[in-house]
Amino acid sequence: MKNEKLPQFQPHFLAPKYWLFWLGVAIWRSILCLPYPILRHIGHGFGWLFSHLKVGERRAAIARRNLELCFPDMPENEREVILQENLRSVGMAIIETGMAWFWSDSRIKKWSKVEGLHYLKENQKDGIVLVGVHFLTLELGARIIGLHHPGIGVYRPNDNPLLDWLQTQGRLRSNKDMLDRKDLRGMIKALRHEETIWYAPDHDYGRKNAVFVPFFAVPDTCTTTGSYYLLKSSQNSKVIPFAPLRNKDGSGYTVSISAPVDFTDLQDETAIAARMNQIVEKEIMKDITIYMWLHRRFKTRPDEKTPSLYD
């Protein structure tokens, strides 16, 4: 079941205006040939550089506010430690994205392991909503799982057509297909064909098709209702969370797959969205330092006239 809408390589991608982009990709791929322990140091260096750029300072302010909103009872100095580690992780994410897109299967397997794979194998005939969260390791996590259990990714097309093509090629290295995050019909069809779809419900996509439910200490977080439509349209599908984690000792990565979460007792979209947020919270707490705190998770408020939480 291939998606014919996937971006295709275009001859004009070789035009002079893209040459600088191609040079950057060539340098990126060359760096990725280095041993993994060296790549870790380079990634941390990128993170240090990011934190000292203006864009990094802006994102750091957003991340600091997100942590304050989610964990108001946590001492400020503890939140600051998490923030600094998170900023350092941003640089490593650049390296890990390249690993996911360009490394060979054998090299990926050498530096990774999967725990809980049996949950996918035992439920693959029912269709699986593989709930991911926006960890900085998400690209690599999808590649690792795909080597053991290929599935279908859900993504937002990139505004840059060349980057959109490149990221699609990278994401298909060990997976079956990609679907636009707005293609709910395609997701439902995939589940009914007993496929596994990677689905991340933890970004603020605006008030359309959304409800406001708790997320950590924020009681009214804008949360997509896509989960409701997926589960009600394919009622046999299993919801299975996973988290791609960095091993603290520098030995690579562990993808942690959890047991299926039951949603059969819930009937309305608000309750389903709230439980999905609880799943996301649990996964985030497996390593709070690698979550994408740099996004404005709480930008949409229930009342449009309410002041922004980021002002």
From Swiss-Prot:
GO terms under cellular component: membrane; plasma membrane
Motif residue range(s): HXXXXD motif: 134-139
One Pfam family, short name: Lip_A_acyltrans
Chemical reaction(s) catalysed: an alpha-Kdo-(2->4)-alpha-Kdo-(2->6)-lipid IVA + a fatty acyl-[ACP] = an alpha-Kdo-(2->4)-alpha-Kdo-(2->6)-(acyl)-lipid IVA + holo-[ACP]
Subcellular compartments: Cell inner membrane
KW Iron-sulfur (keyword) present: no
TM region positions: 19-39
Pathway listed: Glycolipid biosynthesis; KDO(2)-lipid A biosynthesis; KDO(2)-lipid A from CMP-3-deoxy-D-manno-octulosonate and lipid IV(A): step 3/4; Bacterial outer membrane biogenesis; lipopolysaccharide biosynthesis
UniProt keywords, alphabetically: Acyltransferase, Cell inner membrane, Cell membrane, Lipopolysaccharide biosynthesis, Membrane, Stress response, Transferase, Transmembrane, Transmembrane helix
Molecular function GO labels: acyltransferase activity; Kdo2-lipid IVA acyltransferase activity
Membrane topology listed for this record: Single-pass membrane protein
Enzyme class, UniProt record, top EC level: transferase
EC number(s) given by UniProt: 2.3.1.241
GO biological process: Kdo2-lipid A biosynthetic process; lipid A biosynthetic process; lipopolysaccharide biosynthetic process
Job description of the protein: Catalyzes the transfer of an acyl chain from an acyl-[acyl-carrier-protein] (ACP) to a Kdo(2)-lipid IV(A) to form a Kdo(2)-(acyl)-lipid IV(A).
Xref: PANTHER family: LIPID A BIOSYNTHESIS LAUROYL ACYLTRANSFERASE, LIPID A BIOSYNTHESIS LAUROYLTRANSFERASE
Family the entry assigns: Belongs to the LpxL/LpxM/LpxP family.
Protein name as it appears in the record: Lipid A biosynthesis acyltransferase
Taxonomic path: Bacteria, Pseudomonadati, Pseudomonadota, Gammaproteobacteria, Pasteurellales
